[in-house]
């Protein structure tokens, strides 16, 4: 199961306990970046009156020029904030290398300051894993030399950190 599906299960359990229900929409489109998303926000997020958006472009924004990716990432955030009461949680799934072993820069370095400016909480999966383990622990979440697509254990780990973050807000 993907981290999104596992996070949905967590929400369903919380909703049951509180007598509520959730309407889960996974509006992510595989392989797309924030330049594509900025054109979809109105129809896919705001129109559907989402309560929470998990924003994750740490892999696919890499291919955009820096000025464009920063503007479009911020554009997605601004549209959500200006047109709805939707909460935003940013997710940074940091990548280390592509399938040929070439190191890739982390988008967290560019996206986190934008999130900080708008006071958007985030989960940095790699930072969370390394805080409690080692680089070898992080590498175990992949089955191939590329560290872009996590295995099932990786998805479970991502979901666990997201749910931990959300549980903290729920408990407040």
Residue ranges and their predicted role:
Residues 81-89, 120:
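A short helix->loop->beta-strand "cap" motif at the edges of active sites that frequently abuts
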Residues 94-127:
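Substrate-gating cap/lid alpha-helix
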Residues 121, 138-171:
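Histidine-centered active-site loop/cap adjacent to the catalytic His
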Residues 55, 90-92:
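Structural beta-sheet core signal
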Residues 1, 29-34, 59-64, 94-99, ...:
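Solvent-exposed loop/turn segments at secondary-structure junctions
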Residues 35-70:
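Oxyanion-hole/transition-state-stabilizing segment in secreted/luminal serine hydrolases
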Residues 1-28, 40-49:
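Serine-esterase "nucleophile elbow" of acetyl-processing enzymes
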Residues 68-75, 105-109:
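Charged helix-capping and loop-helix junction motifs
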């Amino acid at each position: 199961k993907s981290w999104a599906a596992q996070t949905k299960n967590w929400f369903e359990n919380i909703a049951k306990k509180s007598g509520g229900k959730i309407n889960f929409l996974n509006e992510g489109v595989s392989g797309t970046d924030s330049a594509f998303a900025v054109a979809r926000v109105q129809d896919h997020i705001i129109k559907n009156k989402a309560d929470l958006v998990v924003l994750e472009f740490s892999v696919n924004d890499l291919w955009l020029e820096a000025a464009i990716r920063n503007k479009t990432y911020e554009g997605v955030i601004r549209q959500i904030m200006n047109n709805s009461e939707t909460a935003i949680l940013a997710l940074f799934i940091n990548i280390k290398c592509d399938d040929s072993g070439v190191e890739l820069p982390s988008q967290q370095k560019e996206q986190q300051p934008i999130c900080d400016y708008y006071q958007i909480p985030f989960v940095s999966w790699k930072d969370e894993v390394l805080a409690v383990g080692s680089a070898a622990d992080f590498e175990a979440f992949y089955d191939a030399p590329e560290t872009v697509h996590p295995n099932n254990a990786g998805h479970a780990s991502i979901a666990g950190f997201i749910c931990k973050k959300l549980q903290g807000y729920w408990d407040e």
